[in-house]
Amino acid sequence: MDLNNPPSKRFGDDDDIPANKRPKNEEYPEIPGYLGNRKPSYTQNPNSGPGKLHYASPRPNNVSSSVGVASGGDRQEADQLQDALISCGIQLKEEELNLSTSFYDPSSLNTFALTTEDRSRKSDFLNSFVLMQTVSNIVNLHRLKSMDSDIHALISMAVRDYLANLLQKMIVESHHRTSQLHTDNYKQVDNVRQTLANFAYKEYESEERRRTVLNIRRAEHEARLAELNSASTNEEGSSRRRKEQSSSAAAKNISEDAQNRMTNATASIMAGSALPSGGKKYSWMATDMTPMTPAVGGGFGIRKKDSNSLKPSSRDGVLPLQQEEKGIITIRDALAVLEMDREGAGRIFGRGAKAMMRAYIRLKD
């Protein structure tokens, strides 16, 4: 290709050449942009057949093709773009409406939902015939005129929700009953049972000492009062003989209760239990007064031990946990939930009370 010489100008490249001298394609007729102020359109028209063009109505003289002041080239491009959208079958108003609304429209996606009935207020949990008959009997009993049609469905849904809550609580009670406490991280350092027994024994000893000291002080106080009373009656003489007589008379005037208290206090002091530091306790003072069980055979022999094989026991004093089967709701779980139920002002009456009594009787048996 020669780049120095410009290419020769072909026939038909110049716009100044009249249209009648241009080559025409007979298979595709020429489509003019404007023919008598009428625009061509590719949409369907009942007067035109398939594959034919029809022209829209002429534009009014007072309406411009573009808004504002625009050049002739911009107006022509806007008109050509509008013609292209119309020829493709795109409707601008519908596209604008689709863009302004949400993408998810249940009514347009699910056409079956529009044809079916509303199930939001209906429930098949209870038998509708029996429920309607029961409600009608109650309405007639109270002499009511009319009743809403949604009452039966609401009663059925309320019963379903109430029973679902009760069953959920029973399941929680069952898990709580069968669950075990994880005590692997804790170790028992001391014997708690023996420690508590020692505390109780020490407290018992301190209480006995306190009572003994109080009895001694009470007896001394009563003896002093008796001495003062006897000294006031015998004012004459200060000899030794009169003093001995006054002391013997004072001892005789002491009541029997005071004498018994003084005797017990003296015995306690002699035994050593009344001292603050304690004293020696003999075996005959610590023995229990309960009678011994007779030997086997009625004579001297080996004592028969009590059979405690049925009772669970442990060396450290802690009872072992009972192994129960999991995943079962027992009568105890149901009764615990019903007792803690606060429906109906926290009271159980009517058939509910009868059901509770039957459950308790069955549990007792």
Curated annotation (Swiss-Prot):
Family that this chain belongs to: Belongs to the TAF4 family.
InterPro entries assigned to the protein according to its UniProt record, in alphabetical order: Histone-fold (IPR009072), TAF4 (IPR045144), TAF4_C (IPR007900)
Coiled-coil segments on the chain, per record: 202-236
Protein name as annotated: Transcription initiation factor TFIID subunit 4
Keyword tRNA-binding set for record: no
Gene Ontology terms for molecular function: protein heterodimerization activity; RNA polymerase II general transcription initiation factor activity
Encoding gene (name): taf4
Organism field: Schizosaccharomyces pombe (strain 972 / ATCC 24843) (Fission yeast)
Swiss-Prot/TrEMBL GO biological process terms: RNA polymerase II preinitiation complex assembly; transcription initiation at RNA polymerase II promoter
Region of interest called Disordered, as start-end residue ranges on this chain: 1-76, 225-259
PANTHER family, per database record: TRANSCRIPTION INITIATION FACTOR TFIID SUBUNIT 4
Job description of the protein: Functions as a component of the DNA-binding general transcription factor complex TFIID. Binding of TFIID to a promoter (with or without TATA element) is the initial step in pre-initiation complex (PIC) formation. TFIID plays a key role in the regulation of gene expression by RNA polymerase II through different activities such as transcription activator interaction, core promoter recognition and selectivity, TFIIA and TFIIB interaction, chromatin modification (histone acetylation by taf1), facilitation of DNA opening and initiation of transcription.
Histone-fold domain: residues covered: 164-227
Main localization of the protein described in the UniProt heading: nucleus
Subcellular location: Nucleus
Ranges annotated as biased composition (Low complexity): 63-73
Gene3D superfamilies referenced in this protein's UniProt entry, alphabetically: Histone, subunit A
Keywords: Coiled coil, Nucleus, Transcription, Transcription regulation
Any one cellular-component term (Gene Ontology): transcription factor TFIID complex
Domain of life assignment: Eukaryota
Quaternary context: The 1.2 MDa TFIID complex is composed of TATA binding protein (TBP) and the 14 TBP-associated factors.
